[in-house]
Curated annotation (Swiss-Prot):
One of its GO terms (molecular function) is arsenate reductase (thioredoxin) activity. Disulfide bonds join C11-C83, C83-C90. The active site is at C11, C83, C90. Catalyzes the reduction of arsenate [As(V)] to arsenite [As(III)]. GO terms for cellular component: cytoplasm. GO terms for biological process: response to arsenic-containing substance. SMART domains: LMWPc. This is Arsenate reductase. Transmembrane segments: none annotated. It catalyses: arsenate + [thioredoxin]-dithiol + H(+) = arsenite + [thioredoxin]-disulfide + H2O. Belongs to the low molecular weight phosphotyrosine protein phosphatase family. Thioredoxin-coupled ArsC subfamily. Its EC number is 1.20.4.4. NCBIfam families: arsC_pI258_fam, PRK13530.1.
Length: 134
């Protein structure tokens, strides 16, 4: 964790979107960032999120579903909310913490193609961030 920035992906249940974002973040940003995720609540990692990431050869079976940790939130360099609910109810962040919102549809309970689409959209967005810093 030495001298790496912290990026913290947040969504409602830390089950689907933020789990996939954490995995893509580790894939594209892991050399420069400590990549973490959490939720307003912890619903457990959705098995379809695991399956969707496995399709692109990324294993998230060891990731855990966690509630937002105030210490991590306060130390993060960048907080990214991935759904409107998390954006609205996320605890206030200190002025030095940059906070952005990248909205994605919630794939939970949707057909398989929605999981694949959201997975790919999140991956493309994080890849763009890795390449451009925005």
């Amino acid at each position: 964790m030495e001298n790496k920035k912290i990026i913290y992906f947040l969504c409602t249940g830390n089950s689907c979107r933020s789990q996939m974002a954490e995995a893509w973040g580790k894939e594209y940003l892991g050399d420069k960032w400590n990549v973490l995720s959490a939720g307003i609540e912890a619903h457990g990692v959705n098995p379809n999120a695991v399956k969707a990431m496995k399709e692109v050869d990324i294993d998230i079976t060891d990731q855990t579903s966690d509630i937002i940790d105030r210490d991590i939130l306060d130390k993060a360099d960048l907080v990214v909310t991935l759904c409107g609910h998390a954006n609205d109810v996320c605890p206030t962040t200190p002025p030095h913490v940059k906070r952005v919102h990248w909205g994605f549809d919630d794939p939970a309970g949707q057909e398989w193609s929605v999981f694949q689409r959201v997975r790919d959209e999140i991956g493309a967005r994080i890849k763009k961030f890795a390449e451009t810093g925005e």
